[in-house]
Amino acid sequence: MVTIRLRRMGKTKQPSYRLVVADSRAPRDGKFIEIVGHYNPVRQPKELHVKADRVRYWLSVGAQPSETVVRLLKQVGVLDADGKPTPTATTPVEG
């Protein structure tokens, strides 16, 4: 199974995290498929950047976000209050 989770980076006592798509069996800081954002809780205000289109893609193909990632994605607006992806505006395609 593929998960969207945090990967710890940074120095000792100064953590920063990358939001990565990884196989659920891989170690926390091990091999990953794609980086979809980063989160720095040390800076004030806390810094969070997410590639929303890539996160929506991975959710659409069945990736499971961790509990912490769900909370962060709700803050950014990628997920709604129920934890489901927010709908995106689509444009009609001319045939």
Curated annotation (Swiss-Prot):
It comes from the Bacteria. GO terms for molecular function: structural constituent of ribosome. GO terms for cellular component: cytoplasm; small ribosomal subunit. GO terms for biological process: translation. Gene3D superfamilies: 3.30.1320.10. It holds the Pfam family Ribosomal_S16. Keywords: Ribonucleoprotein, Ribosomal protein. The keyword Ribonucleoprotein applies. The keyword Ribonucleoprotein applies. Belongs to the bacterial ribosomal protein bS16 family. HAMAP family: Ribosomal_bS16. This is Small ribosomal subunit protein bS16.
